[in-house]
């Protein structure tokens, strides 16, 4: 009835059903669905919670409640829901990841990392090197470590857990970023040069290299020399020729590459 635009009649019928059986989790769940349909999310959450008290094992009600909680940014409530869903289906990696994300959204990065570590400790056999889901989980955990400000630990984790990661480019980019933040200058320079060798058209790599080299924004000639090097190394590279035009002016533009 609600899908046919008869919202008032649908609510009236749901209330009649509740009067007939106040302890029916199905009636309360449907009541919550009706409130969600009219975007009254607070009342929908109340109805879902009541339905869940009547039927704590209902995965569908728990899932609907969790979706509304995250939509309403009720992070603590979302954590409780995700923990319940994890206890019900602890064998699924997505249950652990979802709980970690809940803690992440609530601002508790350390607990989010702990949840992912706890899942790793439940594994009897190491994941396959071709397991894409595991690769993504490793990178997510690495981002949590880095967001906590522990760059040294993040680099160590990237080197160990990420060495077989399927997204090799992401690993190389993060490694260069971490080395630069740790002020390991020579290693950072080498890492960014390797990235430019992979893709000489990406501006971010040049920016990272110049920053790692410690070149001042006003040192136009030194910065130009970096671009000249790669313009000569990769004759068909447009970025190495174009990017210096963002800061060069006057006589600095004169030369074999820019003439």
Locate each region found by the language model.
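Position-specific recognition of the canonical hydrophobic site in helix A of tetratricopeptide repeat
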Residues: 2, 29, 33-36, 63, ...
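Canonical tetratricopeptide repeat
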Residues: 30, 64, 98, 140, ...
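Conserved structural position within tetratricopeptide repeats
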Residues: 15-19, 49-53, 83-87, 121, ...
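Short coil turns that delineate tetratricopeptide repeat
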Residues: 22, 56, 90, 124, ...
């Amino acid at each position: 009835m609600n899908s046919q635009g008869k919202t008032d009649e649908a609510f009236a019928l749901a209330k009649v059903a509740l009067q007939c059986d106040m302890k029916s989790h199905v009636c309360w769940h449907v009541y919550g669905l009706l409130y969600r349909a009219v975007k009254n999310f607070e009342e929908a959450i109340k109805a879902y919670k009541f339905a869940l008290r009547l039927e704590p094992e209902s995965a569908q009600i728990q899932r609907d409640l969790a979706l509304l909680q995250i939509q309403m940014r009720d992070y603590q409530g979302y954590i409780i829901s995700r923990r319940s869903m994890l206890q019900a289906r602890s064998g699924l990696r997505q249950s652990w990841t979802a709980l970690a994300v809940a803690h992440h959204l609530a601002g508790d990065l350390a607990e989010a990392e702990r949840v992912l570590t706890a899942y790793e400790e439940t594994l009897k056999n190491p994941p396959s090197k071709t397991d894409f889901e595991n690769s993504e989980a490793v990178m997510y955990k690495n981002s949590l470590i880095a967001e906590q400000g522990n760059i040294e630990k993040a680099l160590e984790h990237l080197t160990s857990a990420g060495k077989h990661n399927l997204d090799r480019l992401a690993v190389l980019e993060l490694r260069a970023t971490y080395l630069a933040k740790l002020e390991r200058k020579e290693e950072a320079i080498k890492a960014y040069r390797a990235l430019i060798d992979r893709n000489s058209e990406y501006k971010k790599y040049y920016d990272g290299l110049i920053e790692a080299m410690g070149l001042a924004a006003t040192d136009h000639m030194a910065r130009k020399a970096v671009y000249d090097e790669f313009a000569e190394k990769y004759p068909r590279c447009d970025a190495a020729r174009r990017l210096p035009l963002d800061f060069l002016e006057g006589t600095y533009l004169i030369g074999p590459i820019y003439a």
